[in-house]
């Protein structure tokens, strides 16, 4: 998926909006705390209601390449234009996946519901029949080559449990060990939905998802399985939505992003209507020509759910100077999980979990959000930069990043449940990537706190990107990104 040279370069050029255009807007409060109070949960919920209606009118989803997504683009773009923003909706190509026939027969001949992971290779119409090898769940379920030690999986259909690492990593490790196909069992009592292997070129073996109960039943009765995943992938188009303030320095741009698409399985109201709605309302409250020191570029990404495609194509298309002009990136993806966590991206790697720290300046961004939530009586935890959201392409090129997050398919620990409430040992969002990701299942309290955090973070860096919680500027920025 690196076939966009001319198209993407032209797209990126269109995204650098001039700071000298005319327009009259109310000034943003110079006090970020005061500004945070202007982004209310009622207003954010109003946007979620509209996104849910869009999904309901378009086969229940807003996934990339569908009429539901196009209607979501129009909704966001029209509101921004009405507020005086110059809005662009640049197109990009991405790979559209068709799962085709999906079938799994257990050793006893019974049918087991199965769903192909996005970009899975095809078994062909007749499928694969092979013995099942179940990899026991541990702290790294199928995420490390050592999980396969002592097990012959050559030519087998391997079963692993969801969690800890991306599905593409699980698939790669199974393929490296010679597996003919992979099944991933959910860690909740539901079908595994909305899962992706990353990008088409990452796909090596047929990979399907099953429910937790099905996974347990399969593991308890090993034998030969027959798997049919007659998949196909084709190139189609989607769009980002980009709008930048007409005021503020254009060599210290604050980019604020949220992905606009849902998975095909549902309306995507938490993932990621919540982030979209909070960023959109922040933009509307700020206006197109506020009294700020640094320009703010609001970005609503397409095709995140199929491999961060919109944000990746955007970053790939930026010139060296355009990259240097971006001071930092703020990412907001899932802000109202029903078993909510209060998480800030771990910019300094103080949690020492998974990946290392973000680029220089990310630690300060983390402190900005942690301190804001602390002021509301909320003790936030860190969350790893694990590459599962649109900050990924930015940190890859050295741009500091941060944001808040209410949790997805990770489990809430007993310590977290004690300080935040909710259910320990249950996932933050049991409706993740399902038809139940709807407005009725949004935690309004978490949404209110996190939406205010969005506004606070944006206003903070719109006024000043330096200081104790700032990011490198000038020569220090150049040096930090070339080391």
What residue spans do the PLM features occupy?
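Soluble metallo-hydrolase cores and metallopeptidase-like ectodomains found primarily
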Residues: 119-143, 199-269, 281-284, 288, ...
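His/Asp/Glu-rich mid-to-C-terminal helical/loop segments that flank catalytic regions of hydrolases
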Residues: 411-482
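Second-shell loop/turn segments in exported
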Residues: 30-40, 57-68, 134, 138, ...
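Noncatalytic luminal/extracellular "stalk/propeptide" segments of secretory-pathway proteins
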Residues: 27, 37, 46-49, 53-152
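Metal-dependent peptidase/peptidase-like ectodomains
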Residues: 291, 301-412
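C-terminal region of N-terminal signal peptides and the immediate post-cleavage residues
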Residues: 4, 15-30, 467
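Extracellular/luminal Protease-associated
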Residues: 66, 113-211, 267, 380
